[in-house]
């Protein structure tokens, strides 16, 4: 075949037959495989680009869109910023400057949706930005806010109040620092200045008049209500910040108590004696002096940049001159003279709200004036300029009530009634009347009482009726009410009128179910009245019967209140302590009657309240008229149960000693204050550390880990917890001190050993702390004049061996009981050294033939330690024959086995300290 023919064969078309499958090509790709998706949740390699939101826009993209001409784009950018910052909060700190500058710039945007998105974003950002972080940028924020408040567009002004609400909530100190500008803005929001030539020479109070803008979406009255509500919040933040500043500078305490020191030094003499507390004698003598002064450093800026805020009386007076006439106009607009005749039937909701905000602003201005008016010059100036206007406009129709108006519709009438009722409940006409009363009585004093008697009597009648009306008052209403009552009591010399007012307050105090803030305010009010009466001289002192009745009922209230309200209980205790220290007879009588409930060891206030209140209650024991046996029994239980701290229990024991006849003080009031028998019974009960019932329950314990049992002693040892042991040991030292100061040492020793013989001898289970404390007291009381009861010696010997056996069998891993070893070893050795008969009886009880094989090494170790101890060496030498016999019996029992190391050591010690002594036994051949 020619080459041309072969070339044609390469391009021949294959003819396919119908019904036959197409043959597969040689280079065909196989498609019969399966695939699975691979999910990558994150990239291992970090992307250096900025995080993006759902629209893949980062922070720079979103901030750049804030400059777009379209309002929709800017709104979308603000919403995207909120979405991005909620997903990546760390961006806020990194781009805070740019975020604030762009967001605040749209406060004055002409698009309402953009402004709404900006307010929502600011509401989201404010809780996440701390004050110290936003502080450098706050002048910019304040400038944009001021621009929005003074903008000519009504919608921008309305939205600026929303921004102000956010800043007042989260940054009150920063926003009130710009008060010089913002206060002017508030004035301009509701008024405008007259610029006519005839008014140039007028004062600034007459150059401002209320403005009316018909283009607003709300009425002028509703707009003023919004502005006045924000102004009230702003002044409240300003007043709170001013009071905190004055308290930090120490001015508040100096004003109330001029002779008191602002800084007190609390000294713990135990810590000072151990060089654990350093005392700085001079207040400003440390490395960092803290000087409290009434003077402030003046600003070094130029005179033209002085901040005209309300921190000085002159600036405050200037603002009052501008705002008070405007507030009076708002009042007249809300309550026109032509409608004044119908005020008796009540004022509608919206005008009443305006009146409430007017009074709130005036009240806060009065509060600011009191903080700065140290010479009472502002008070007289306010009375001179505004008392006449206030009486004419405010007091002419006092008190005011709410007029309920129910708007009914043809459809859904019930829903309309419900909606109207909810709105009406937001208006507190009682608080309005109380605020007005507070403002008015602050303008009066005792010297002007005769001139102001008419309207003061009206306020007094209203206050008395409100207190006796039985209405449930909240803390805000009651605070105003008690403030007015206190002012009336201060300026009123008439005792009958004062008594009626106090009686009205007491009527409110007797209501059940009062909330904690309400009850606290009432207690503080009565306490203030009582302290005021006590400060007077005895001749001029007037004791109110109602106040005496209230004071006498406090102990019973405290006994029932307990721990249900610790704060209220603390306030009651402070008042009771003050009255008891001043020997108020009625209170002391009722305190005596309620003492068993107050000092109950299970549920009494003395064990359930915090430590500070417990200390005050313990101190009250010094003022109780009598201390009967049942009360002393409860006090003993309080000491030993551990519900009182060891130091407080020691204080209690010391107070009872001062009340006893052994203190050497003469008791002229009542010789039967506390009998000696009851006092000594209290000391012994506290010394044992356990009640009779608890000791009886312990006798049934056998075979438990807390009980140490030995075959050579009839007394079993109950192991107490370490905390209980240390607490018992601390109060035992106080009991020892109380017994040591009794002049007749031998008599107190006889009483103690008689009590031990009666209540402890015969018990088979004794707590380790009780045995150790008994030994400690006997060692300290024992002297040459004391005679030990023979029947007591076997019990002491058995307890001593049980304690020593417990100490010698302690394991190194038992860290809790190892801390008891030194204290118990010391008292055991001391009792054996002071009472040789106890040592002899203990040695006689060591019948090793009855001991278990595990106990023999313990007996041998005990004998070796007793031989090595120097204070006991002479007594061991006296009992050498007895010791020799015990060692012989031990050696006999161990003769069948290889001699152990402990037995070799025992033989060596015996040969050194007994056999080697000149007075020792001469023949020991049977043993060696």
UniProtKB/Swiss-Prot annotation:
**Compartments (UniProt record):** Nucleus, Nucleolus; Nucleus, Nucleoplasm; Cytoplasm
Describe where the HEAT repeats fall, as residue ranges on this chain.
99-137
What are the record keywords, sorted?
A: Cytoplasm, Nucleus, Phosphoprotein
Q: Which Pfam families match?
A: Ipi1_N
Q: Which Gene3D superfamilies match?
A: Leucine-rich Repeat Variant
Q: What is its main location?
A: nucleus
Keyword tRNA processing attributed = no
| Positions of post-translational Phosphothreonine modification | 29
- Gene Ontology terms, cellular component aspect? mitochondrion; MLL1 complex; nucleolus
Q: What does this protein do?
A: Functions as a component of the Five Friends of Methylated CHTOP (5FMC) complex; the 5FMC complex is recruited to ZNF148 by methylated CHTOP, leading to desumoylation of ZNF148 and subsequent transactivation of ZNF148 target genes. Component of the PELP1 complex involved in the nucleolar steps of 28S rRNA maturation and the subsequent nucleoplasmic transit of the pre-60S ribosomal subunit.
Q: How does it assemble?
A: Component of some MLL1/MLL complex, at least composed of the core components KMT2A/MLL1, ASH2L, HCFC1/HCF1, WDR5 and RBBP5, as well as the facultative components BACC1, CHD8, E2F6, HSP70, INO80C, KANSL1, LAS1L, MAX, MCRS1, MGA, KAT8/MOF, PELP1, PHF20, PRP31, RING2, RUVB1/TIP49A, RUVB2/TIP49B, SENP3, TAF1, TAF4, TAF6, TAF7, TAF9 and TEX10. Component of the 5FMC complex, at least composed of PELP1, LAS1L, TEX10, WDR18 and SENP3; the complex interacts with methylated CHTOP and ZNF148. Component of the PELP1 complex, composed of at least PELP1, TEX10 and WDR18.
Q: What family does this belong to?
A: Belongs to the IPI1/TEX10 family.
Under which name does UniProt file this protein?
A: Testis-expressed protein 10
Classification of source organism: Eukaryota, Metazoa, Chordata, Craniata, Vertebrata
């Amino acid at each position: 075949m020619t080459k041309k023919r072969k070339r044609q064969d390469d391009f021949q078309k294959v003819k396919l037959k119908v019904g036959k499958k197409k043959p597969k090509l040689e280079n065909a790709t196989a498609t019969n495989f399966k695939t699975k998706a691979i999910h990558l949740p994150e990239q291992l390699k970090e992307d250096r680009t900025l995080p993006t939101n759902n629209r893949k826009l980062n922070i720079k993209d979103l901030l750049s869109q804030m400059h777009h001409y379209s309002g929709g784009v800017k709104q979308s950018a603000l919403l995207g910023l909120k979405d991005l910052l909620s997903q990546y909060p760390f961006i806020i700190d990194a781009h805070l400057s740019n975020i604030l500058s762009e967001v605040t710039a749209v406060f004055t945007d002409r698009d309402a949706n953009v402004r709404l998105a900006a307010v929502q974003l600011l509401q989201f950002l404010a809780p996440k930005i701390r004050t110290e972080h936003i502080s450098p940028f706050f002048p910019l924020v304040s400038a944009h806010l001021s621009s929005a408040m003074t903008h000519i567009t009504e919608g921008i002004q309305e939205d600026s109040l929303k921004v102000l609400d956010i800043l007042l909530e989260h940054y009150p100190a920063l926003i009130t620092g710009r008060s010089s500008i913002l206060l002017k803005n508030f004035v301009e929001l509701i008024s405008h200045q007259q610029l006519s030539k005839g008014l140039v020479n007028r004062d600034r109070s007459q150059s401002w008049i209320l403005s009316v803008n018909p283009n607003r979406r709300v009425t002028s009255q509703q707009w003023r209500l919004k502005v006045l509500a924000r102004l009230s919040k702003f002044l409240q933040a300003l007043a709170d910040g001013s009071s905190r500043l004055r308290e930090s500078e120490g001015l508040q305490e100096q004003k109330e108590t001029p002779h008191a020191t602002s800084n007190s030094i609390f000294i713990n003499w135990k810590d000072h004696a151990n060089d654990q507390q350093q005392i700085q004698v001079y207040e400003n003598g440390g490395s960092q002096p803290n000087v409290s002064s009434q003077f402030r450093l003046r600003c070094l800026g130029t005179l033209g940049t002085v901040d005209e805020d309300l921190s000085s009386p002159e600036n405050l007076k200037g603002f009052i001159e501008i705002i008070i006439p405007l507030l009076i106009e708002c009042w007249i607009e809300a309550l026109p003279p032509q409608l004044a005749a119908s005020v008796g039937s009540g004022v509608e909701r919206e005008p009443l709200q305006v009146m409430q905000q007017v009074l709130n602003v005036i009240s806060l201005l009065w509060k600011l004036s009191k903080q700065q008016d140290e010479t009472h010059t502002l008070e007289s100036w306010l009375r001179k300029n505004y008392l006449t206007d206030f009486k004419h406009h405010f007091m002419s129709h006092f008190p005011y009530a709410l007029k309920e108006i129910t708007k009914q519709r043809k459809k859904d009438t019930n829903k309309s009634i419900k909606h109207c009722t909810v709105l009406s409940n937001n208006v507190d006409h009682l608080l309005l009347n109380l605020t007005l009363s507070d403002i008015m009585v602050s303008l009066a004093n005792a010297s002007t009482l005769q001139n102001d008697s008419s309207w003061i009597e009206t306020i007094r009648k209203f206050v008395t009726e409100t207190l006796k009306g039985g209405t449930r008052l909240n803390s805000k209403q009651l605070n105003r009410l008690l403030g007015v009552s206190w002012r009336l009591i201060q300026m009123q010399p008439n005792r009958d009128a004062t008594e009626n007012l106090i009686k009205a307050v007491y009527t409110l105090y007797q209501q059940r179910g009062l909330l904690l803030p309400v009850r606290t305010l009432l207690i503080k009010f009565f306490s203030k009245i009582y302290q005021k009466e006590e400060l007077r001289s005895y001749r001029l002192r007037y004791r109110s019967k109602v106040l005496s009745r209230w004071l006498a009922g406090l102990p019973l209230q405290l006994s029932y209140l307990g721990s249900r309200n610790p704060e209220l209980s603390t306030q009651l205790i402070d008042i009771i302590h003050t009255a008891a220290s001043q020997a108020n007879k009625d209170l002391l009588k009722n305190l005596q009657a309620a003492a068993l409930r107050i000092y109950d060891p299970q549920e009494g206030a003395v064990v359930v309240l915090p430590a500070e209140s417990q200390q005050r209650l313990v101190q009250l024991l010094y003022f109780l008229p009598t201390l009967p046996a049942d009360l002393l029994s409860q006090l003993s239980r309080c000491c030993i149960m551990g519900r009182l701290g060891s130091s407080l229990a020691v204080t209690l024991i010391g107070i009872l000693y001062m009340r006893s006849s052994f203190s050497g003080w003469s008791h002229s009031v009542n010789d039967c204050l506390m009998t000696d028998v009851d006092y000594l019974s209290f000391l012994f009960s506290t010394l044992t550390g356990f009640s009779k019932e608890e000791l009886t329950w312990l006798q049934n314990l056998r075979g438990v880990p807390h009980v140490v049992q030995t075959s050579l002693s009839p007394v079993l040892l109950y192991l107490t917890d370490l905390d209980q042991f240390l607490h018992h040991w601390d109060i035992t030292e106080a009991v020892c001190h109380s017994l040591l100061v009794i002049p007749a040492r031998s008599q107190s020793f006889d009483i103690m050993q008689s009590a031990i013989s009666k209540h402890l001898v015969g018990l088979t289970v004794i707590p380790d702390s009780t045995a150790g404390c008994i030994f400690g007291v006997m060692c300290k009381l024992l002297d040459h004049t004391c005679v030990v009861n023979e029947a007591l010696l076997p019990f002491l010997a058995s307890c001593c061996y049980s304690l020593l056996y417990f100490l010698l069998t302690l394991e190194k891993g038992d860290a809790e009981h190892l801390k008891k070893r030194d204290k118990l070893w010391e008292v055991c050795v001391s009792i054996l050294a002071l009472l040789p008969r106890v040592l002899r009886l203990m040695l006689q009880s060591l019948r090793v033939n009855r001991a278990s094989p595990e106990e023999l090494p313990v007996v041998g170790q005990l004998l070796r330690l007793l031989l090595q101890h120097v204070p006991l060496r002479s007594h061991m030498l006296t009992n050498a024959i007895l010791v020799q016999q015990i060692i012989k019996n031990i050696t006999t029992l161990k003769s069948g086995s290889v001699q152990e190391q402990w037995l070799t050591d025992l033989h060596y010690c015996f040969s050194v300290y007994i056999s080697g002594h000149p007075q020792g036994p001469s023949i020991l051949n049977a043993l060696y």
